[in-house]
């Protein structure tokens, strides 16, 4: 069970304490539990959505978004901000992009990107609440964290050393693909046709963002992985709200 606790601690802000320093193998196996963590977050959001029934719509959507951000501790938003600054400030240069990505300060591009992504998420949540598409709250966090597993299965990690390298080097790849297949099946059981739309959108966004990473960096980093999750979740939410 330790890999599950590692995944919960790393991906969320829940008060999880590990019994000791995990081994690289345990870190790698924790990736297999990322979709399960996403499912847990989704169930929490779905339950909150039910509890908020009758709340004014704008407040309803705002509270859902706030809890969504709090569940992850804004970890992935931080990666999105760093990636946005680095992508524009890097001027197409790999080393410059990686250097800017490590800078903890956020520039105007990062701020604008965060505002736009959160605004689109909020608007999509508002529309989904009106349309009573509550199952989206379960499957979107699941798909987003399954995408992280897919990214590490298909993409090299470009920063030597550290947590990301351990995740990439010790991920059980055959089991990883099986977990992705099960995750897709769970989405289909939960949301039916809407899950088909969500999965297709997720695959398209995943392929596009992965292509950008590989072309610029030759692989992924922790920051670009976080950016992928945020942009993919936002895109799927908007897509479900529109279709």
Swiss-Prot record:
Name the Pfam families for this protein. CobS
The GO terms this record gives for MF are: adenosylcobinamide-GDP ribazoletransferase activity; cobalamin 5'-phosphate synthase activity
Give the EC number.
Answer: 2.7.8.26
Record's keyword annotation contains Phosphoprotein: no
Give the record's pathway: Cofactor biosynthesis; adenosylcobalamin biosynthesis; adenosylcobalamin from cob(II)yrinate a,c-diamide: step 7/7
What residue ranges are annotated as transmembrane? 31-51, 57-77, 109-129, 135-155, 188-208
Kindly give the InterPro entries that the UniProt entry links to this protein. Answer: CobS (IPR003805)
Q: Which GO terms describe its cellular component?
A: plasma membrane
Q: Where in the cell is it found?
A: Cell inner membrane
- List keywords of the entry alphabetically: Cell inner membrane, Cell membrane, Cobalamin biosynthesis, Magnesium, Membrane, Transferase, Transmembrane, Transmembrane helix
Catalysed reaction(s)?
Answer: alpha-ribazole + adenosylcob(III)inamide-GDP = adenosylcob(III)alamin + GMP + H(+); alpha-ribazole 5'-phosphate + adenosylcob(III)inamide-GDP = adenosylcob(III)alamin 5'-phosphate + GMP + H(+)
Its domain of life?
Bacteria
A biological process from GO: cobalamin biosynthetic process
In the bilayer, the protein is annotated as: Multi-pass membrane protein
Q: Which cofactors is this protein said to need?
A: Mg(2+)
Entries under PANTHER family matching the protein = ADENOSYLCOBINAMIDE-GDP RIBAZOLETRANSFERASE (PTHR34148:SF1)
**Family per similarity comment:** Belongs to the CobS family.
**What job does this protein perform?**
Joins adenosylcobinamide-GDP and alpha-ribazole to generate adenosylcobalamin (Ado-cobalamin). Also synthesizes adenosylcobalamin 5'-phosphate from adenosylcobinamide-GDP and alpha-ribazole 5'-phosphate.
Which protein are we looking at?
Adenosylcobinamide-GDP ribazoletransferase
| Biological source species | Pseudomonas fluorescens (strain Pf0-1)
Task: Tell me what gene encodes this.
Answer: cobS
